[in-house]
């Protein structure tokens, strides 16, 4: 009798253990950890193909922070992505103009020169009041109302191309204007502008962080192909990013097709410095 009683009481306990282990396995798979950072300018949620759009949204939800092209998404989609705990930054090209933008014809007269390696793009005169006003009071207002967590601003490198005081002040005017929306601003590239603003003490009043492409990798635009960065350029960028960090700016890296061993090196570097990085599959940033 005692033996029979022991067998009966043990069986439910065994079932409970099995159920617990299965449940643990299920939730572990379902709640895979998010990636830290991703830049996805080449994808959108408005293709009109429901399954594809849903796949895009799910991809973005798998990151803690993403950069996307706001015109490729609806405010409702941005809210859906954010509901999963993802911070969403919107891309805004302040130093150049692409010929596929609906406002291209209105502003091409303010362009300065073609953008090398980017056939559809032109450097812009950022000192022009009409361009400044459009970025600040039209696009800035429109995009901020979509519920973005911040702006990702491209091509302050215009100051490297045209190192004139009016260009420098024009960029500062645009950044100051965008600050009215109380959103963090991250500058993509623009090391010459960033370092000058650090030197004159205005950096932290203008923007909050920097993203630098190709610290550890580089792009051969003739193919295109993706290679390891040369030592001299890598050392320059590392010194520059240390200056940015010391100035109180957050730092992000975007690399292209870093292989496994190089990715481990970048992981160690970013972990040591407190930076975030994204390993892009291609220039299309999909």
Residue ranges of predicted features:
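Bacterial N-terminal signal peptides
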Residues: 14-23
